Amino acid sequence: MSIEEIPQGADVNVIPKNEKKARELIKKLNLKQIKGITRVTFKQRGNLIYAIDAPDVYRSAAGTYVVFGEAKVDDMNQRIADAQAAQAAETDAHAGHTHSHGEEDKSPEAITADLEKASLTEKIEEEEEEGEVDESGLDAKDIDIIVEQTQVSRAKAVKALRKHDGDMVNAIMELS
């Protein structure tokens, strides 16, 4: 079939020569094709996301995956900036309306204030727990390791160790 015979607007996938060779090699490796996957995303530092729509996914016996498809770069920072700009435009459009419909304020400033308020209450609760902690019967090295591994207060580490009868692994798993 030549290019002239393909109808206008038809959805045609052209497979590059290298990809075709790779697919043939995969068939020789006895990888299983996984059906039903509609999208694969890979996240990288800095909110950079690579998305593959309608991928061909293969799984090896060892549990590794091979993904074929066209990767598109999706910058989450740009999406967030666009969403904030749209929300700011919407807020400006509704600036003339001062009456409330019983809804909470969803502006970025209100959300930030709510988050700060919530984090302050958590800090107050943590400070209340921080008082003198009875470490008798527990190894100080165990407590230090749990604090180092889970980044929690010494009081929480002691509490978790006591709950699990001195079992460091279960205490770390609970706090992680």
Swiss-Prot record:
SMART domains: NAC. GO terms for cellular component: nascent polypeptide-associated complex; nucleus. GO terms for molecular function: phosphatidic acid binding; phosphatidylinositol-3,5-bisphosphate binding; phosphatidylinositol-3-phosphate binding; phosphatidylinositol-4-phosphate binding; unfolded protein binding. PANTHER family: NASCENT POLYPEPTIDE ASSOCIATED COMPLEX ALPHA SUBUNIT-RELATED (PTHR21713). It comes from Scheffersomyces stipitis (strain ATCC 58785 / CBS 6054 / NBRC 10063 / NRRL Y-11545) (Yeast). It comes from the Eukaryota. SUPFAM superfamilies: UBA-like. Residues 91-110 have a biased composition (Basic and acidic residues). One of its GO terms (biological process) is protein transport. This is Nascent polypeptide-associated complex subunit alpha. The keyword Nucleus applies. Residues 138-175 form the UBA domain. Belongs to the NAC-alpha family. Component of the nascent polypeptide-associated complex (NAC), a dynamic component of the ribosomal exit tunnel, protecting the emerging polypeptides from interaction with other cytoplasmic proteins to ensure appropriate nascent protein targeting. The NAC complex also promotes mitochondrial protein import by enhancing productive ribosome interactions with the outer mitochondrial membrane and blocks the inappropriate interaction of ribosomes translating non-secretory nascent polypeptides with translocation sites in the membrane of the endoplasmic reticulum. InterPro entries: EGD2/NACA0like, NAC-like_UBA, NAC_A/B_dom_sf, Nas_poly-pep-assoc_cplx_dom, UBA-like_sf. Its main location: cytoplasm. Residues 16-80 form the NAC-A/B domain. Keywords: Cytoplasm, Nucleus, Protein transport, Transport. Part of the nascent polypeptide-associated complex (NAC), consisting of EGD2 and EGD1. NAC associates with ribosomes via EGD1. It is found in: Cytoplasm; Nucleus. Residues 83-110 are annotated as: Disordered.
